[in-house]
Amino acid sequence: MKTYGTTQGQIAFAASKNHFHGSLNEKAQYQFEVSVEDVLKDREISYPLTRAMCAPIGDGAAAALICSEKGLKHFPTEIQQRAIKIKASVLSGGKYRTPQETGLSRVAAKKAYRQADLEPKDINFVEVHDATSFCEIYQLEMLGFCEIGTGGKFVEEGHTQLGGKLPVNLSGGLVSKGHPVGATGLSMIHELAVQLRGEAGKRQSKRNKIGLAENGGGVIGFEEAACSVIILEGSH
């Protein structure tokens, strides 16, 4: 915040936006809206974070059926038509980094873009691991959607909300959808699949050909111990 000028208000905007998205998700843990003002007024956890900026731990489960293109042909036509293609799947391990170094998700994202033969501008919508709402701002920068230090402004300008140029965490993110820990990563994949199939209802992204999910866990110094970036493409 001191280096790049990211504000508490911008973090609150990200939180409020995700609470709105969560209010449209019948599977979200928190299905209510929270204004930017109320996010800022909420109980402080550790400055600049208030309670409404932090993900709640909750129960949950998620599953996915994965098969080869050849194996898909053995399924009924209606299932084949709903299949989602894995364009890239990358898992990167962390190391001790200084606060000045780019994060592990930048490493994983670059590999994923190469694997998928895509660029950040090709991604239509994103799910990121927002254990806190600051994480969303940070990951937008690491994933290459905006320049380092400009994530807060990018969010505040409304680009990441439903109907924006890059909708982020249409599920509500961890902050609103909830953080079922072991099921969190796969729940992001579920949201991508729902969006790619055009089945997200009121929170449906208009542009829904290609989606990206970033998930991280563990800690090494200032960094995640592991990070995955997955890019999926719809069949339409």
Task: Report each predicted region and the residues it spans.
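Short glycine/threonine-rich loop-to-helix capping motif typified by GTGT followed
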Residues: 97-102, 130-153, 164, 180-182, ...
